[in-house]
A protein has these predicted regions:
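A residue-level signal for conserved active-site and pocket-lining positions in enzyme catalytic cores
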Residues: 1, 63, 118, 157, ...
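A non-catalytic, helix-rich entry segment at domain boundaries
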Residues: 2-96, 193-206, 214, 219
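Short loop/turn segments at secondary-structure transitions that flank enzyme active sites
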Residues: 6, 10, 90, 135, ...
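C-terminal substrate/ligand-recognition segments
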Residues: 6-10, 128-129, 154, 179
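Short, polar/flexible loop-turn hinges at active-site or ligand-entry regions and domain interfaces
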Residues: 12-19, 142-143, 166-171
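Active-site-adjacent bridging/hinge elements
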Residues: 33-39, 125-136, 183, 189, ...
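Non-catalytic protein-protein interaction segments used by genome-maintenance enzymes to assemble
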Residues: 83-166
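Metal-dependent nuclease catalytic regions and adjoining charged, substrate-binding loops involved
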Residues: 158-223
Length: 223
């Protein structure tokens, strides 16, 4: 994650987004990878140098593949990488009103903090990308069958973006928020995405209307 964070920040700073999969992109990756490797050596036990070198070579191959695929087949061509390891919170998750005449002030809300690996932004749109080390079939399964059942992370991230005005300081939060898992090993995002506006809405009226199909209601019930 640290290598990708520094790489995308470098490309953003240099006005080199979207990625181009050229010599400049590859040189930037090598600079960032080397800098992170030096930091790693100072902080961690590295074991046998030859084994570390093998791991670094494999990592470089994976990241070069990711850069190439993203440059040539972006998951959302209308959005650009914009925020990296984005901290958020406290995101207020309200409790359901407990009875007739109850108000939001009567409840004890949850306040959730977290870090989103990457956010891509476009006109009125935001895309959450959640980095994963594994292969895509497992994450396609989660998106298809496990959201709001055993997996709350992506819906919470998406809900955060619907109210996070820091992403659009001169305007309103994005009208459309979608989320995908991103396999770093394969350099691809899931084909399936989370784009259910009712699921991620923090509007009390939506929560009441969709009942168990809303992240705020389900997460609070689980607590």
């Amino acid at each position: 994650h640290a290598v990708l964070e520094d790489f995308y920040r470098d490309r953003q700073r240099e006005g080199r987004l979207p990625l181009r999969d050229d010599a400049d992109d590859r040189a930037a990756l090598d600079r960032v990878l080397q800098a992170q490797l030096e930091q790693f050596k100072k902080k961690e036990r590295i074991g046998h140098p030859a084994l570390l070198a093998v791991r670094v070579r494999r990592l470089r191959v994976d990241l070069l593949r990711l850069i190439s695929r993203e440059a040539n087949d972006p998951s959302d061509p209308d959005c650009l990488p914009a925020r990296f390891e984005h901290s958020f919170g406290p995101l207020r998750i309200a409790a359901a009103k407990s009875g007739r005449g109850a108000s939001d002030d009567d409840s004890q809300p949850l306040h959730i903090h977290g870090i989103i690996d990457r956010i891509d932004l476009g006109p009125g749109r935001a895309v959450v990308l959640d980095y994963k080390a594994g292969r895509l079939p497992r994450y396609e399964q989660i998106l298809a069958h496990e959201l709001l059942d055993t997996s709350f992370q992506l819906p919470l991230y998406a809900a955060e973006l619907t109210v996070d005005k820091s992403l659009f300081p001169i305007g309103e939060p994005p009208a459309q928020v979608t989320t995908r898992y991103y396999s770093l090993r394969q350099g691809r995002t899931t084909r399936k995405l989370l784009d259910n506006a009712d699921m991620i809405s923090l509007d009390p009226q939506v929560r009441q209307r969709v009942q168990g199909g809303n992240v705020e209601a389900v997460v609070f019930a689980e607590e």
